[in-house]
Amino acid sequence: MNKEVLDSILPTMDTNDIVELVHNHLCGLRVMENKDREDVKVEYGLNEDIEDNSREELINALYKMNKKINSR
């Protein structure tokens, strides 16, 4: 999904939905980069337990992960 799509859907999502989207992006990046899930979390500034991140931290990580995914 592109940045414009994220811009439009994130304000309508609750934190649980954003956590789920982060998990999905992590799975995609883990496969694309052939890295351990924990390494990918660290790379994008996420806590071990995704749910322990603030909404802002989750959204920032999503934009970074989304940019990486779209650059491939």
Segments and roles (model prediction):
Residues M1-R72:
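Short amphipathic alpha-helical interaction elements located at domain edges
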